[in-house]
Amino acid sequence: MKILEKIKIIEQSDKTRVEREIKILKMLRHNNIIQIYQIIQTRSNLYLIMEYANGGELFDYIVLKKRLPEPEAVKFFQQIINGVEYLHKLNIVHRDLKPENLLLDHNKNIKIVDFGLSNLYGRGELLKTPCGSPCYAAPEMITGKKYSGLMVDVWSSGVILFAMVCGYLPFDDSNNDILYRKIAAGDYKIPNFISDKARDLIKRILNTDPTKRYNIQQIKNHPWFNINAPSINEGLLIHLYTIPVKFE
């Protein structure tokens, strides 16, 4: 359950963001995306009743295991990409993909959560608002350029892939200026214990040039992605509609 305090939703921009998040959640029907069941309103709070994922965050799972064996990482990555592809088919960009926003259910299947920074976009539309977590942000976003929401989600998925198989982040620094310079330059090293196929896929996703970065279909066609036969779930495409939310 997600609880939103109405007293903290004061500005019109905040109201718009919450309405958009709820509207997006109501559209989604996919095995690898968290399901919203009900919205309960009181005078002070909004309660979003969500699907229960009792396996915790992927972040904690990676920390517990130090790093994931590649066959297990492939399974998780397939599910992440399947979920992201479904979002993009609905013209939704997540913009805050990271292991903390990926939950595991009782069968250790991925559930993408937290659509607070998500947005809807038109075909070919470029976005301009920088958002998300710095370590997972794409170079074009942190340098203030207009960006393709699809490609920033792909970049973030590549950072997640690196974190799963390596056990640490490709770009990390306590000083954000230094961190951003590393991201913009694509300054990272892949350890020797990573397989050649995984290494190749990581390099193709973490390309600082979004026009040369692998897209979803190229990722799905890559040999590493297909080490284990992926279980494809297309999800349901539901038409967008407005969910009334009152903040008075």
What are these regions (language model features)?
Residues T211, I216-E248:
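C-terminal regulatory tails of eukaryotic serine/threonine kinases
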Residues I3-L28:
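Conserved N-lobe beta3->alphaC-helix segment of eukaryotic protein kinase catalytic domains
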Residues Q38-I39:
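A short, aromatic-enriched beta-strand patch in the conserved N-lobe beta-sheet
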Residues F76-F77:
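Activation segment signature within eukaryotic-like protein kinase domains
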